[in-house]
Swiss-Prot record:
HAMAP family: ATP_synth_delta_bact. Its main location: membrane. NCBIfam families: ATP_synt_delta, PRK05758.2-2, PRK05758.3-2. The gene is atpH. This is ATP synthase subunit delta. It comes from Roseobacter denitrificans (strain ATCC 33942 / OCh 114) (Erythrobacter sp. (strain OCh 114)). InterPro entries: ATP_synth_OSCP/delta_N_sf (IPR026015), ATPase_OSCP/d_CS (IPR020781), ATPase_OSCP/dsu (IPR000711). F-type ATPases have 2 components, F(1) - the catalytic core - and F(0) - the membrane proton channel. F(1) has five subunits: alpha(3), beta(3), gamma(1), delta(1), epsilon(1). CF(0) has four main subunits: a(1), b(1), b'(1) and c(10-14). The alpha and beta chains form an alternating ring which encloses part of the gamma chain. F(1) is attached to F(0) by a central stalk formed by the gamma and epsilon chains, while a peripheral stalk is formed by the delta, b and b' chains. GO terms for molecular function: proton-transporting ATP synthase activity, rotational mechanism. Belongs to the ATPase delta chain family. The keyword Oxidoreductase does not apply.
Length: 186
């Protein structure tokens, strides 16, 4: 991991832990989840919002005023709105995407859930997804939510990532291994 990425991940983790603890103490974890969904939707849909949190051009005051107005318009909880304002004051808004993903991980961990990123050559059927989730639940001991995507370059098979574990059963991976083995021999 590069140094800037590890720094922003560390900053995001500290804010996420603090926000989660506040939400848990005030029994508003569900509200926090709603805030995360709203903010992730805004980041995905609005390039201007992304530019606001990433750009060093805006002053602390401009960022804080804009974030406060946006938080009110989005209907964010006081905890999240105050956190974003504090992050603007400290010039830390650039870690908001990592903050949101870290918060999701903390909430899932607390609920005994885990998200598995599954990449397949073609879309999984409902039966296949259910069977895979059941198998992963037996392996991890946690409720598994699948985040499925399609990559036709895999040719066949799956690539499954659960936390730091990755299982690659794709045809592409097997062909690459075979190609490397042939290079070593010849």
């Amino acid at each position: 991991m590069s140094e800037p990425a590890s720094i922003s991940t560390g900053v995001a983790a500290r804010y996420a832990t603090a926000v989660y603890d506040i939400a848990k103490d005030s029994k508003s974890v569900k509200t926090l989840e709603d805030d995360i969904n709203v903010l992730q939707g805004a980041l995905a849909e609005s390039a201007d919002f992304g530019a606001l949190i990433m750009s060093p051009i805006y002053t602390r005051e401009e960022q804080e005023a804009a974030i406060s107005a946006l938080a009110a318009k989005m209907g964010l909880s006081a905890t999240m709105a105050n956190t974003l304002s504090l992050m603007a004051q400290k010039r830390r808004l650039f870690v908001v995407p990592q903050l949101l993903s870290t918060l999701r991980e903390i909430i899932a961990e607390d609920k005994g859930e885990v998200t598995a990123d599954v990449v397949s050559a073609k879309a999984l059927t409902k039966t296949q997804a259910d069977k895979l989730a059941k198998t992963l639940k037996a392996s991890t001991g946690k409720t598994v939510t699948l985040n499925a995507s399609v990559d036709e370059s895999l040719i066949g098979g799956l690539v499954v990532k659960v936390g730091s574990r990755m299982i690659d059963t794709s045809i592409r991976s097997k062909l690459n291994s075979l190609q490397n083995a042939m290079k070593e021999v010849g």
